[in-house]
């Protein structure tokens, strides 16, 4: 009877103690550490020697069996979500198992996506290396990064990694790489894009080409020569310098790229070699020399000298010289008129038009008029005269004498005011 009583008393004390698994924190986020503890409430560790092992689902974690009742997990990830439990083994190979505990790992969505460039500022020389760095301020787990070119969105590359930043590299930048870029990051909660970043590719100027343009095939003194310099490649703005031999003629700017022109009025000293230089701050390039040769005719020099002397004399003598020259010309004109027509005598020979006295109406003789040049102002005078036959009767002579007395004093008669169609008499003669 006594052995049975002792068995009933000792039975509860001899049963294996219950195990509990404790996770700290119990609801971890991705990337955070977690500590697992295998615990027996009524059993002190000094009372017995145990070996512990931790499991997730059916897989053992850590180093396997260990004397430590704790397991430290450095970082938990979304895929670490599952059912966890632990086991304890006594020296007598008795194994105790805890209940299962569900641990859910929470993922943080990506946020605040940004795109940066290296070199900074988005300006890069042609042929240099360009790096596009996509970053997120927050987000956990595996993040997929994608890079796009242009507002339309040409996909360049994608990377998936457990990191807050990722890089896309262009080893050697070309002119066609000048565009707008952006990146997208996502970790299972939808894509989150960055802002647009403009990339400017700076291109050094190529060797410029110089062209000389003259108004004629053979350039001459006083012609305006156009010097046109153009670099076919190069980022604007471009500054052009123009040279005659090694003498600087001037400069012109092309703010939007392309070429520029410089005009030069040619003199005798402008024969020789011309060149130009292009510079956009990334290095200067000089054109090949262009030779311009032209000759100055001797006659042109003497004519140029004579006209210069005359112009100098006129400018020195001034209005007095002009007045004297005018008076001299007027005097010559008056003398020429006097020699040709002294005292405005009748024209000789007389016009061969006749009116005979034996006509049926002898009293209706018509005078013959000819215009005389202007005497003064705008008045025009005419010359009137008669012709008489050499052989006439006595009666006719008497009549002719009477008629001559009547008109002899009336040789000049004023006819009318001058108009624009009157012709100078002496000019008509």
Curated annotation (Swiss-Prot):
Claim: Transmembrane helix is one of the keywords in the record: yes
Short sequence motif ITIM motif 4: positions: 410-415
Motif (ITIM motif 2): 367-372
The UniProt record lists the keyword DNA-binding: no
Subunit-structure text: Interacts with ABL1. Interacts with GRB2 and SOS1. Interacts with SHIP-1/INPP5D.
Function: Type I transmembrane surface glycoprotein preferentially expressed by B-cells that regulates BCR-mediated signaling responses. Recruits ABL1 as the intracellular effector molecule to enhance B-cell activation. Also plays a negative role by suppressing ERK activation under homeostatic and BCR-stimulated conditions in a GRB2-dependent manner.
Protein name: Fc receptor-like protein 1
Species: Homo sapiens (Human)
